[in-house]
UniProtKB/Swiss-Prot annotation:
Organism: Rattus norvegicus (Rat)
Signal peptide segment: 1-23
Functional note: Serine protease that cleaves beta-casein/CSN2 as well as several extracellular matrix (ECM) proteoglycans such as decorin/DCN, biglycan/BGN and fibronectin/FN1. Inhibits signaling mediated by TGF-beta family proteins possibly indirectly by degradation of these ECM proteoglycans. May act as a tumor suppressor. Negatively regulates, in vitro, trophoblast invasion during placental development and may be involved in the development of the placenta in vivo. May also have a role in ovarian development, granulosa cell differentiation and luteinization.
Cystine residue pairs: 31-54, 35-56, 40-57, 45-60, 68-82, 76-87, 89-107, 96-132
InterPro entries according to UniProt: Growth_fac_rcpt_cys_sf, IGFBP-like, Kazal_dom, Kazal_dom_sf, PDZ, PDZ_sf, Peptidase_S1_PA, Peptidase_S1C
Stretches assigned to the PDZ domain: 365-450
IGFBP N-terminal domain ranges (all copies): 27-90
Lineage: Eukaryota, Metazoa, Chordata, Craniata, Vertebrata
Protein name: Serine protease HTRA3
């Protein structure tokens, strides 16, 4: 009798499950033969990122407490596992973070770290298992009052990068390492300053040289050289991140005094974010004294340890300002850095040269940055104007220009260039200046369109 009573309930449950399965969305379209990353969205994911079903784009992972295990559910994020259809943390013990807070588990700490990266660029790391000791919150303790070096490192580390130069072997397709070093981020859009010898090589082997840049949070990008001066040993390289990056500011090396505390940070022997400290031994050491006969530079001498791989990394003062680029080690306790005033001059010359180049390259549009006030103004004139929060509004297309020939029209909204979201018109100008081909994602009415534009060089 009891088995007969359970049968209707079981059938009802199966029927409900069948309806649930049938009610799901139909399967997605088959994977493309070739991934077009310019079509990938740029999600902000509290639960982290995972590859999509086609292993082409990054999509949001399921966060703790979200459903999982069904065909259309996203995989669980980092340190999570699917337990009875719900994402749960693999570990249940409390942990102490570098921000001084106690977290219920590792997953809660990682979620806080992702939020912190988006806000300040500084991740939260695990200090220890268990709750934080009470001393972490006692900001008047000697540990917190006098650890000024740690304060500087915490401020500058997110903007220091590791750089590797490879040679792509033409026959075997393998990357042969040529050199490695460090650099620091100068602009939120991805401009990086380093040494010229870090990003160039005299190796005569055939093959294509490639630059790889790794950020503190583990993100890696391919980089291109923007400008290089081998005599002064300064170079700038460019990456194309999908979000704004933390930056360092240049100080005035002319104000340096012998005896000042300085901090050197870089990647000696590929050990990323290695910190050494010291003082300024001499603020102006003539390059000719170092045996550099053609030198016209006065170097900063410091006793901060600089090893192979530190080259290109920043030498900073206690305010976190860059006062030099770590360049040369002569002996233990005797190292040298290119002064920041020389870097400033190099960047100014680079900017002047590129402004001239900008006048020679154009795509032929008059544009305005999308702002809430501009959207309101355009919606007043055209109620069907799309609801957009960022991008570039095409006010006018120049006749017979690359944009007109490529299909751009008045009133279009350019939302991405080469897969990167556009927030300001200067970002499109920079792309016109630095990239030979532009893949523009355009919003026209309710349609999203792709156009390939080749900037024109005016002699």
């Amino acid at each position: 009798m009891q088995a007969r009573a359970l049968l209707p309930a079981t059938l009802a449950t199966l029927a409900t499950l069948a309806v649930s399965v049938l009610a799901r969305e139909p399967p997605a379209a088959p994977c493309p033969a070739r991934c077009d990353v310019s079509r990938c969205p740029s999600p902000r994911c509290p639960g982290g990122y995972v590859p999509d079903l086609c292993n082409c784009c990054l999509v949001c992972a399921a966060s703790e407490g979200e459903p999982c295990g069904r065909p259309l559910d996203s995989p669980c994020g980092d340190s999570l596992e699917c337990v009875r259809g719900v994402c749960r943390c693999r570990w249940t013990h409390t942990v102490c973070g570098t921000d001084g807070h106690t977290y219920a588990d590792v997953c809660a700490l990682q979620a806080a770290s992702r939020r912190a990266l988006q806000i300040s660029g500084t991740p939260v790391r695990q200090l220890q298992k268990g709750a934080c000791p009470s001393g972490l919150h006692q900001l008047t303790s000697p540990r917190y009052k006098f650890n000024f070096i740690a304060d500087v490192v915490e401020k500058i580390a997110p903007a220091v990068v590791h750089i590797e130069l490879f040679l792509r072997h033409p026959l075997f397709g393998r990357n042969v390492p040529l050199s490695s070093g460090s650099g620091f981020i100068m602009s939120e859009a991805g401009l990086i300053v380093t040494n010229a010898h870090v990003v160039s090589s005299s190796n005569t082997a055939s093959g294509r040289q490639q630059l790889k840049v790794q950020l503190q949070n583990g993100d890696a990008y391919e980089a291109t050289i923007q400008d290089i001066d081998k005599k002064s040993d300064i170079a700038t390289i460019l990456i194309h991140p999908n979000k704004k990056l933390p930056v360092l500011l240049l100080g005035h090396s002319a104000d340096l005094r012998p005896g000042e505390f300085v901090v050197a940070i870089g990647s000696p022997f590929a050990l990323q974010n290695t910190v050494t400290t010291g003082i300024v031994s001499t603020a102006q050491r003539d390059g000719k004294e170092l045996g550099l006969r053609d030198s016209d530079m006065d170097y900063i001498q410091t006793d901060a340890i600089i090893n192979y791989g530190n080259s290109g990394g920043p030498l900073v003062n206690l305010d976190g300002e860059v006062i030099g680029i770590n360049t040369l080690k002569v002996a233990a306790g005797i190292s040298f850095a290119i002064p920041s005033d020389r870097i400033t001059r190099f960047l100014s010359e680079f900017q002047d040269k590129h402004v001239k180049d900008w006048k020679k390259r154009f795509i032929g549009i008059r544009m305005r940055t999308i702002t809430p006030s501009l959207v309101e103004e355009l919606k007043t004139a055209n109620p069907d104007f799309p609801a957009v929060s960022s991008g570039i509004y095409v006010q006018e297309v120049v006749p017979n220009s690359p944009s007109q020939r490529g299909g751009i029209q008045d009133g279009d909204i350019i939302v991405k260039v080469n897969g990167r979201p556009l927030v300001d018109s200067s970002e499109l100008q920079e792309a016109v200046l630095n990239e030979s081909s532009l893949l523009l994602e355009v919003r026209r009415g309710n349609d999203d369109l792709l156009f390939s534009i080749m900037p024109e060089v005016v002699m």
